[in-house]
Swiss-Prot record:
This is Cytochrome P450 4g15. Expressed in larval brain cortex cells and ring glands and weakly in larval digestive system and adult nervous system. The gene is Cyp4g15. PANTHER family: CYTOCHROME P450 4G1-RELATED, CYTOCHROME P450 FAMILY 4. One of its GO terms (molecular function) is heme binding.
Length: 574
């Protein structure tokens, strides 16, 4: 009887389950390894730091954002062109040779973003940053003309007005050490609202500051998900405090973009086109002129018109095509076509064109418009806020370089407090070199990741990165490649003298990415930054108590400083 009971226990469902579980797992593992044989075979030929069995370098990407970034860069840097890392079963390959970067970024085949971008989905939907295929192509083609120079020139007045507002706000910090990033972040949001979105700040019941802070915190959450194997799981993520906080932040972010679209649609229905903020500026200027004339409307003076005509003639004669606008001179993309080729009807600001296209039957829905607005608001504000903050920090450290920038601005403007013109920005050659050098040493987007659907044969050596791998352009290492830059860790604006650029590989400098998926707003960003930063430096001298060796870099999606961007301002004029 005892024997029968034991036999029955051995034949119970639970015992059969456990008996079959082990061989099932073994067979599954064998199948899984065989299905990845091609990946493992090619990965075995790639150089990289030694990792632990099974987990690879998983523990290197767990921890504080600043330490993760430093560890990954430190372990990759000793390898000349390429470095592989295993994050558990995931193969990540870092490339930082310009020849290899060109292969990846210039291709129309390797354009799929890495799987980590899926965490942006609740925020950005299928906007330009993460969409693929025909949807991405058609929307990119639709949006690109809204960031051509002829459109951007119409924003000059708004760039100036918002820059003067920043200068006024900075008076509260005279002589004190403070974090300039908060000011830069708020300013870039408000400039975006008035230019690309074409709405007035007066229609917003909250400033851009709350939006900017929400975006920064969202980036923290996304980066936490990138670093945690548990938070990557959607179900586990919904059980955490991060999920609730993400919902609150998205209410702020989407609340602003929804309000922007609603405001712009209302203006459209009333037949108003163009920037509402620009209309307000013009109305205010006319009112001031009317008051100066004793309340009598007069025929507009031809003097102002003649001045504008002379300005336009200067712009036409200027070597605009020779300017880089945030990338290596000579590197071209869909933002570099002749402005006359885009047609008069397409010379509309971003949101104007989106709404008009939908109204005229283009294949873009209200949801897709919102996704693109969310994307442009994110990409257009956080990157330039970081870039301008690094620039001011570096000016504060390198007083001799700041002297040359101030001398250049004084030669352009003299003692005048007049607003900058487009022609003025063309003459800010040394300031532009300083800005480009800032973006070289501290690129706002430190990593550009793509997921390979096909093998990628590299040019730098006899290496093939297998399909299924995530290949990442390590922009920080690319921009500090000692074979490209003589003193890669020294801040030297002369790295961007025309003769030096001419001898450099086009893809040795890609702060806004490059190729088909380059940042659609890079020209917008450079023009905005030149006017914003020149306006600040015309009014203030910048100081810093730190050196670059004190910078603790962290990459929460966007490259920033862990300790913040602390500077001190001294007024240049009374």
């Amino acid at each position: 009887m005892e024997v029968l009971k034991k036999d029955a226990a051995l034949g119970s469902p639970s015992s059969v389950f456990y008996f079959l579980l082990l061989p099932t797992l073994v067979l599954w593992y064998i199948y899984w390894r065989l299905s990845r044989a091609h990946l493992y075979r090619l990965a075995g030929r790639l150089p990289g730091p030694r990792g632990l069995p099974i987990v690879g370098h998983l523990f290197d990407v767990i921890g504080p954002a600043s330490s993760v970034f430093r560890t990954v860069i430190r372990k990759s840097a000793p390898f000349e062109h390429i470095a592989k890392m295993w994050i558990g079963p995931k193969l990540v390959v870092f490339i930082y040779d310009p020849r290899d970067v060109e292969l990846l970024l210039s291709s129309h085949v390797y354009i799929d973003k890495a799987s980590e971008y899926k965490f942006f989905k609740p925020w950005l939907g299928d906007g330009l940053l993460i969409s693929t295929g025909q949807k991405w192509r058609s929307h990119r083609k639709l949006i690109a003309p809204t960031f051509h120079l002829n459109v951007l020139k119409s924003f000059i007045e708004l760039f100036n007005e918002n820059s003067r507002n920043v200068v006024r706000k900075l008076r509260a910090e005279d002589g004190r050490t403070f974090d300039c990033h908060d000011y830069m972040s708020e300013a870039t949001v408000e400039i975006l609202l008035e230019t690309a979105m074409g709405v007035s700040k007066k229609t917003q019941d909250k400033s851009g500051f709350e939006y900017a802070m929400a975006v920064m915190r969202m980036c923290d959450i996304l980066h936490a998900r990138h670093r945690s194997i548990f938070l990557r799981n959607e179900f586990v993520f919904t059980l955490t405090r991060y999920y609730k906080e993400q919902g609150r932040l998205l209410n702020i972010i989407h609340g602003l973009t929804t309000k922007v679209i609603r405001s712009k649609k209302a203006a459209f229905e009333q037949g108003t086109r163009g920037s509402l903020a620009q209309c307000e500026l013009k109305a205010a200027a006319l009112e001031r002129e009317r008051e100066q004339n004793g309340g009598v409307d007069q025929t507009p003076s031809t003097a102002g018109s003649d001045e504008k005509d002379r300005e336009k003639d200067k712009e036409k004669a200027s070597p605009v095509a020779g300017l880089s606008y945030g990338q290596s001179a000579g590197l071209k993309d869909d933002l570099d076509v002749e402005d006359n080729d885009i047609g008069e009807k397409k010379r509309l600001a971003f949101l104007d064109l989106m709404l008009e296209s939908a109204q005229n039957g283009a294949l873009i829905t209200d949801t897709e418009i919102k996704e693109q607005v969310d994307t442009i608001m994110f990409e257009g504000h956080d990157t330039t806020a970081a870039g301008s903050s690094f620039f001011l920090s570096l000016m504060g450290i390198h007083q001799d370089i700041q002297d040359r920038v101030l001398a250049e601005l004084d030669s352009i403007f003299g003692d005048s407090q007049r607003p900058a013109t487009f022609q003025d920005t063309l003459e800010m050659k040394y300031l532009e070199r300083c800005l480009m050098e800032t973006l070289r040493m501290y690129p706002p987007v430190p990593l550009i990741a793509r997921e390979l659907q096909e093998d990628l044969k590299l040019n730098s050596g006899n290496y093939v990165i297998p399909r299924g791998a995530t290949v990442t352009v390590a922009t920080v290492l690319l921009h500090r490649n000692p074979k490209v830059y003589a003193n890669p860790n020294v801040f030297d604006p002369d790295n961007f003298l025309p003769e030096r650029q001419a001898n450099r590989h086009y893809y040795a400098f890609v702060p806004f990415s490059a190729g088909p998926r380059s940042c659609v707003g890079r020209k917008y960003a450079m023009l905005k930054l030149k006017i914003l930063l020149s306006t600040i430096l015309r009014n203030y001298r910048v100081y810093s108590d730190l050196t670059e060796s004190d910078f603790k870099l962290q990459a929460d999606i966007i490259l920033k400083r862990e300790e913040g961007f602390r500077v001190r301002l001294q007024p240049r004029t009374s």
